[in-house]
């Protein structure tokens, strides 16, 4: 039974992997464009935030973004292979020492800043 599930997951990943998924990790600032359906119409909504965690689990791979808007912390969990996700773009590479940044949930303002990784920005330029 587990072999059937593995085969199914691999087939679905091949079908949905035509999108460009950049390499990123926790601490990076990402911009995600998602399709939003408002009744009859369809539009793109952009969410930009810091990646708090990334979970690599095949077809169920996901990551969580956090941003602060009007002094409110907003979190969004995004599945990598979801058909709703239109594009993922890395804005800034952050320098952190942890894989899961749960301590960031209680931080606001200057204390929530993440330093930029200079080694990754030089390679991209």
Swiss-Prot record:
The keyword Ribonucleoprotein applies. GO terms for molecular function: structural constituent of ribosome. InterPro entries: Ribosomal_bL19, Ribosomal_bL19_sf, Translation_prot_SH3-like_sf. Keywords: Ribonucleoprotein, Ribosomal protein. It comes from the Bacteria. This protein is located at the 30S-50S ribosomal subunit interface and may play a role in the structure and function of the aminoacyl-tRNA binding site. This is Large ribosomal subunit protein bL19. It comes from Ehrlichia chaffeensis (strain ATCC CRL-10679 / Arkansas).
